Amino acid sequence: MAKQTTMKNAALKQLTKDADEILHLIKVQLDNLTLPSCPLYEEVLDTQMFGLQKEVDFAVKLGLVDREDGKQIMLRLEKELSKLHEAFTLV
């Protein structure tokens, strides 16, 4: 049981880390390369979000992450990206 809890914690930690890396990638992209209206920005964002959602789905299927925890990771990232997008479009 302890090993399963450790695996679940590791999975949640990794998914959260991946979400944070996506947020960082998008911040760097906006700071240095593109505007939120650029198709390249949208493509990178869509690809990264799709990949993270697949990671979450896989972890849920393996029983490493509760579906609700996975949704919360995605929701938190979407909210942060929305704030970031607003900040760059208001400038």
From Swiss-Prot:
- Coiled coil: which residue ranges? none
Q: Which InterPro entries does the record match to this protein?
A: UPF0358, UPF0358_sf
Query: Which Gene3D superfamilies does the protein's record reference?
Result: SO2669-like
In terms of NCBIfam families, this protein maps to: PRK13666.1
Q: Of which family is this protein a member?
A: Belongs to the UPF0358 family.
The identity of this protein, by name, is UPF0358 protein SAB0977
Instruction: Give the SUPFAM superfamilies listed for this entry.
Output: EF2458-like
State the Pfam families in the record: DUF1507 (PF07408)
HAMAP family documented for this protein: UPF0358
